[in-house]
Amino acid sequence: MEDLIVKIFKESSQLKESFVNDNLSIIVRVVNVMTAVLKAGNKVMIFGNGGSAADAQHLAAEFVNRFMIERPPLPAISLSTDTSIITSIGNDYDFSEIFSKQIRALGQPGDIAWGISTSGRSRNVFKGLEQAKKMGLITLALTGKDGGDIAGIADYTLNVASDSTPRIQEVHITVGHVLCQMIDLKLFQRPDIK
């Protein structure tokens, strides 16, 4: 059992290392875009299913409350949390519309729509990003495996090239934390950092 535990930790750390080596330049671009969006007074809408819904809720809380420093709240919302909205759309229309309808209601040009899908194939996440693009929002996808259809629709895609859902999720939350920390740094401590 001990060997298996060590193996899991090593797989997680190795995947994070290969991910950052492959995606560092796009992470920097995403930090700069998100910083500009928030500085302009626009918002971030985050969404996903299952564990990705939990990540969306978690990361929205980091923006709205605080991450590591005391600072003013930043406008972010998880579209995965309102059970009345989600179930009414799912019941009256289709589950694939649960994010796209919310984006139609809440999104404004210049906002960010951030979809999370470990498979890259979640139909409702795809349709949410598709709707966001139609409305002039900036789209960000956090995906796994080969990125799926979602990778092809987003303005910015951070794909974790793995078939292991738990390891993908571990990288996803690390990416979210890195974005929060770098945005805090750029907005409130080191605006000169590139």
Regions found by a protein language model. Name each.
Residues 15, 41-43, 109-112:
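Short, surface-exposed connector motifs at secondary-structure boundaries
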Residues 1-22:
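Generic N-terminal amphipathic, Lys/Arg-enriched alpha-helix
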Residues 1, 23-26, 52, 133:
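Residue-level recognition of alpha-helical structural elements
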